[in-house]
């Protein structure tokens, strides 16, 4: 399949803002591949359309930043001055390269047109290049691609290299296209994607005529992590009890979500971003290997513990453990970790359609019961132990007074609050569900993505000191909700400035526009209505709590979350 044929449809998708039209254009693309291409072409275009050449669970990226791309573009014959001027004018490196493509040194007029397969495989290879001369090799490969490309191809190659296609397409739109073209129930397609995290594989299977509901490659598998199920906000414990009937309450731990996979004695541990963190936590791996059970996927919260106080250490200590590559054993001696497991997603077979109460029963056979109302003395003793693996502390009750006591106790041992779960509910990967709620004592912190950065003043003049922050809507469009600079230490500012310089895509002088890759957790005095921002809301006195290196743009809060918090707080006043 020629890459230019793909780019023509990408151009149509980019030019419309209507989601239904984008869906129709992708259906047109599927039909073109069905007639003129191969099954693997749908795998390739499904990934490329959302700015990827790897499946999400593979934990790989092309790994090229804007600066290296600029260097590669310069070697094609485009001057740095013209390139920077055009980027400033258009705000888009892809459009800039396309507009300046007449300056690119062309190879023979008889050179073959680029194929989709060639572009896809070439960009996958970029991630594998390492060593002292890796930058030169990557620059040469990118340059060669651009020299062979037509103007519109150069636009999309440049954007794909940065993994930001800027065409307004996302996973739900592609899934809707699959559903329409192959005449399959949308919920079925969404569910199968949720257990594979591989839009390309799903597309290839569909166009090959697979019975996707019974295809073994499209089932939940050990060592292929899935996105976590997410909780809703609730205005009160009483409201959540009404929604969940006889709920299961659990402590909401001050830690990091992890997924543990075990099969044939092998253990892998994944973060909420599906990163493989196994090598960073060897003591946990050894403990899990001792469990007399196999072929299982567990979910829990990893907590850094201060064993002298029985309370969790700061969240940054967990990240220090997860990011550590050297002297891991020494770090393990300084920062003790434990996991509180709260779910079993797979045991010999997928369990996500099984009610929570039955999944919990399996969990308790492995790690004990930890019922707060009947085993409190045992729980409080074990909090100070060297034990590493626990089942989460829980309470089954519909009594709001007892639930509030459990909530206050969870806060007293240093954790964030409680979770309220429907015991009859299945597990829905990657979705924010109405069968699980979270209760915290203060305003819910927000996870936001940085979209711009501005040079600081005074003591901060050597760093980017102020950051524009945004949330997303259901179509993954970003909406500015404020600017933040307070709460950041000098170490934070130095770290952020380094990252900003790697991911800036447009320089406006004292301010730069960024790829949306930095996630911050922020607190604030309140959410208020505002005409300043298009979304209609703004954070009053936002303050950075921490840099969330464990989260990506996929994990940030939504416009709906902001509206819900605003309504909850307004009703409390």
From Swiss-Prot:
One of its GO terms (molecular function) is metal ion binding. Its EC number is 6.5.1.1. The keyword DNA damage applies. GO terms for biological process: cell division; DNA biosynthetic process; DNA recombination; DNA repair; lagging strand elongation. The keyword Nucleotide-binding applies. Keywords: ATP-binding, Cell cycle, Cell division, DNA damage, DNA recombination, DNA repair, DNA replication, Ligase, Magnesium, Metal-binding, Nucleotide-binding. It holds the Pfam family DNA_ligase_A_N. The active site is at 252 (n6-amp-lysine intermediate). ATP binds at residues 250, 257, 272, 301, 342, 432, 438. It catalyses: ATP + (deoxyribonucleotide)n-3'-hydroxyl + 5'-phospho-(deoxyribonucleotide)m = (deoxyribonucleotide)n+m + AMP + diphosphate. Its cofactor is Mg(2+). HAMAP family: DNA_ligase. Belongs to the ATP-dependent DNA ligase family. DNA ligase that seals nicks in double-stranded DNA during DNA replication, DNA recombination and DNA repair. This is DNA ligase. It comes from Methanococcus maripaludis (strain C7 / ATCC BAA-1331). The lineage of its organism: Archaea, Methanobacteriati, Methanobacteriota, Methanomada group, Methanococci.
């Amino acid at each position: 399949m020629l890459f230019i044929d793909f780019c023509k449809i990408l151009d149509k998708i980019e030019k419309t803002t209507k989601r239904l039209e984008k869906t129709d254009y992708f259906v047109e693309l599927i039909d073109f591949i069905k007639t003129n291409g191969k099954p693997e072409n749908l795998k390739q275009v499904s990934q490329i359309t959302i700015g990827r050449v790897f499946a999400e669970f593979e934990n790989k990226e092309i790994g090229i930043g804007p600066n290296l791309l600029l260097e590669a573009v310069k070697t094609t014959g485009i001057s740095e001055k013209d390139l920077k001027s055009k980027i400033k004018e258009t705000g888009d490196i892809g459009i800039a390269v396309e507009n300046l493509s007449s300056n690119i040194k062309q190879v023979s007029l008889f050179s073959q047109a680029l194929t989709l397969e060639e572009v896809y495989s070439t960009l996958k290879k970029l991630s594998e290049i390492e060593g002292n001369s890796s930058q030169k090799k990557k620059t040469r490969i990118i340059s060669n691609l651009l020299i062979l490309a037509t103007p519109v191809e150069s636009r999309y190659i440049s954007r794909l290299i940065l993994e930001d296609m800027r065409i307004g397409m996302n996973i739900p739109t592609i899934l809707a296209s699959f559903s329409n073209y192959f005449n399959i129930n949308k919920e079925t397609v969404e569910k199968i994607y949720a257990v594979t995290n591989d839009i390309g594989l799903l597309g290839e299977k569909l166009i090959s005529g697979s019975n996707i509901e019974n295809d073994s490659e499209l089932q939940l598998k050990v060592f292929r992590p899935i996105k976590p199920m997410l909780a809703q906000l609730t205005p009160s414990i009483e409201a959540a009890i009404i929604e969940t009937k006889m709920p299961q309450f659990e402590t909401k731990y001050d830690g990091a979500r992890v997924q543990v996979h075990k099969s044939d004695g092998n253990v892998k541990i994944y973060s909420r971003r599906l990163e493989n963190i196994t090598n960073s936590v060897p003591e946990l791996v050894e403990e899990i290997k001792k469990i007399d059970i196999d072929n299982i996927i567990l979910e829990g919260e990893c907590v850094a513990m201060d064993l002298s106080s029985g309370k969790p250490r700061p969240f940054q200590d967990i990240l220090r453990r997860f990011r550590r590559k050297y002297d891991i054993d020494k770090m393990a001696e300084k920062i003790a970790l434990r996991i509180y497991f709260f779910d079993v997603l797979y045991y010999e077979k997928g369990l996500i359609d099984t009610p929570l109460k039955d999944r919990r029963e399996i969990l308790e056979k492995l790690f004990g019961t930890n019922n707060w109302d009947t085993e409190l003395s045992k729980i409080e003793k074990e909090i100070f132990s060297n034990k590493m693996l626990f089942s989460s502390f829980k309470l089954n009750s519909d009594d709001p007074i007892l639930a509030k006591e459990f909530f206050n106790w969870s806060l007293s041992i240093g954790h964030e609050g409680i979770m309220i779960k429907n015991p009859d509910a299945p597990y829905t990967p990657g979705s924010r569900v109405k069968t699980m709620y979270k209760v915290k004592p203060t305003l819910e912190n927000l996870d936001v993505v940085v979209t711009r950065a501005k040079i600081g003043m005074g003591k901060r003049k050597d760093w980017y000191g102020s950051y524009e922050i945004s949330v997303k809507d259901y179509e993954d469009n970003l909406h500015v909700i404020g600017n933040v600079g307070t709460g950041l230490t000098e170490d934070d500012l130095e770290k952020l400035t380094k990252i900003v310089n790697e991911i800036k895509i447009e320089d406006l002088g004292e301010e730069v526009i960024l790829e949306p890759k930095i996630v911050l957790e922020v607190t604030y005095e309140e959410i208020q209505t505002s005409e300043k921002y298009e979304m209609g809301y703004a954070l009053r006195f936002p303050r950075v709590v921490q840099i969330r290196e464990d989260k990506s743009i996929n994990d940030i809060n939504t416009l709906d979350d902001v509206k819900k918090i605003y309504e909850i707080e307004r009703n409390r006043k």
